[in-house]
Amino acid sequence: MKFSENWLRSHVPIQASREELAATLTAIGLEVEAVTPLGDALGQVVVARIIAAVRHPEADRLQVCSVDAGQGELLQIVCGAPNARAGLVAPLALVGAQIGELTIKAAKLRGVASNGMLCSAKELGLDSDASGLFELPDDAPVGQALAEYLGLPDASIEIKLTPNRADCFSVRGIAFDVAAACASEVAAFDAAAVAPVSTRTLAVELNAGSEAPRYCGRVIEGIDPAATTPVWMAERLRRSGVRPVSLLVDITQYVMLELGQPMHAFDLDTLHGPVGVRRSRAGEQLALLDGREVTLDDSFLTITDADRPVALAGLMGGLDTRVTNTTRNVFLESAYFDPAAIMGRGRKLGLHTDAGHRFERGVDPALAPQAIEVATRLVLELAGGMPGPVVDAALPHHLPQPASILLRRARIARVLGIQIDDADVARILTALGMHVEAAADGWQVTAPSRRFDIAIEEDLIEELARIHGYDRVPTTLPGGASRIAMPSETQLDELSVRRQLVARELQETINYAFVDAALLERWQLTDGVVPLANPLSAELAVMRPRLLPGLVATLGRNVARQVGRVRLFELGKVFSAAGPGDAPVESQQVAAAVCGDALALQWGEPARKVDFHDLKGDLLALAAASGAVLEFQPSTQPFGHPGRSADIYRDGVCIGWIGQVHPRLAKSLDIDVDVIAFELQLAPLVKRALPRAGELSRYPSMRRDLAFLVPDAVSWAALSASVRTSVGPLLREVQLFDRYVGQGVEPGFKSLAMGLILQDNSRTLTDRDVDAVVADVVAVIEREHRARIRG
């Protein structure tokens, strides 16, 4: 929100300096982003009129002007502005004036004397327009100091508003906050009804229910089409970042900036029949003020006449019904539209308007009739005309009602930790425009209709803290015993997990917790998905149920940008629900995804691509840090490559997945390389058993190697489990050191060779002991897995 300092001071008379005012605004939550002084150094700049302008004898683009500066004799000025012409009134910097870094001196330009400089608005620091001389009204008093004529010095102040403070999208809304902070009062404002002179009206039909519950309209006939915007209004608009256009348009903009009510002016003679508000119909077309013709769907609110849409409600007027410099009869609109009915509609069409921005945030539902009276008075004062009666069509049961809240003294003290005097509480709330009545244990407070962000007791307490001053809240240290949680040896913390993965050359990624529903459909992960009620965009419409879809998408973006070796991991929350309407459950997961070369390019190792076993090694290193013993079983997850993926188990419970992403899925994601990934629930992974010191055996270990022919369906995990169960405590380790299929092995079978390492803590094992163990192992494997010893 940008506004003129002098305009604000006209609504709230305060003695604070410009710097103090800016500091106060920031302190009460209206953060000042920029203060631009205007006209502080225009002491020798006056209003002047060009009497004659002739071409410079030595330069085609220069003119020699005779200028009346109110000094009795004409001054000769050489000027290069394209709009310099006889009769033009413009600012003149006299000899000796300081314009920015330039001191004006008498000089000769191409041999012709020049005694001053005719100025553009940019040269004077009043505007960004440098296309020509700053054109002043024809009736501007020649010889008067420009600063005096324009009401300078002034400043343009720009503040940053939080979404809840839509009431401060107006000078008067800001004035209430400043008055409360400076112990002042907001000046009285004349919004009295203007008596109608004619009986001309347009009927108003409300056909959008709660989306458009109020619409005020007024006909004004016989205005002067030659009337122009007065300099005081044009300057206030310009200093608020709005370029003056024409009187009727400028009046609607002026009322919006002053009161916060967007308005629109229609050329009455272009409207056919009653005015209505309704939802658009799919396929309807409308030519907008910016010259574009748009095709609407059924989500827009439209203003209509008897047979067509004539404006997009709350966004932009139509081209066919706009006011022009020939308009004599006008229909003024001032309405309240529900924010939800306007929100997002402008973005659909690539529109961003000041009116739309205000309606999206919320406009005072009681302001429409006042605004139309203020606008009427301005039209009559500046352009004449005969006003008809105001038509105020409303659906009262759909209009928001101000909240009435009990504010308790004890609650103020508990929330803020300080006591605020009763008199200060009443003064602050009253200055903010609230109706305050004393109650037994506090106050009954009714918020003004413009403050729809005030809904509960804590909202009022926030207002008190904001205006009373956060800097007046004493700094106190928290009391009570400090309970600092000590790291537990039975838990591997998240930082350690991150460090372990970083040590394995993985880089951490942080993705949105929201994903595209279409992406989850590709992964076939749509069960238990939690949709968002108000997503940031269609691509971020659901909460992620797993980390892998987002992580692999990030890997794909890196691959698309010619990153050959990608190694990423993420640790974050995932969300799922048992069914529609059930509360979502969140949990922590850790996931990794890799592709490209297994090792960074070097001269000492041959290049090879990363595979399942490389990432499995990274996973086992992570598991070793927590002492977890993981088991792997073939997986049937639809997003995994058949035969190259496994479910991960700990203590018999499935806690994750590892494998190659299915090639079809990778191709649909525009990834043309093999992607290896894993994903784990964090909680079962990080459980860590307390380390126990074991006795080192003084006796030697013995090894026996065995090779079995086993059916293809038998996994090494099943085989090794049988060995461990059979041997018992004598088994130190069982290792798979060879797998063979081919000549000498019948189809449907494979040869697995294992090494058994045996050791006893109390004695040296004999060959007889070892042979007995081997015999038991052979018998168990042959019995349980239909295997046979390979000769």
UniProtKB/Swiss-Prot annotation:
Q: Which cofactor does it need?
A: Mg(2+)
Annotated ranges, domain FDX-ACB = 697-790
Query: Single GO molecular-function term?
Result: phenylalanine-tRNA ligase activity
Q: Supply the InterPro entries for this chain.
A: aa-tRNA-synth_II/BPL/LPL (IPR045864), B3/B4_tRNA-bd (IPR005146), DNA-bd_dom_put_sf (IPR009061), Fdx_antiC-bd (IPR005121), Fdx_antiC-bd_sf (IPR036690), NA-bd_OB-fold (IPR012340), Phe-tRNA-ligase_IIc_bsu (IPR045060), Phe-tRNA-ligase_IIc_bsu_bact (IPR004532)
Q: Where is the tRNA-binding domain?
A: 39-147
Q: Which PANTHER family would you find in this protein's record?
A: PHENYLALANINE--TRNA LIGASE BETA SUBUNIT (PTHR10947:SF0), PHENYLALANYL-TRNA SYNTHETASE BETA CHAIN AND LEUCINE-RICH REPEAT-CONTAINING PROTEIN 47 (PTHR10947)
- What's the protein called, per UniProt? Phenylalanine--tRNA ligase beta subunit
The gene it comes from is pheT
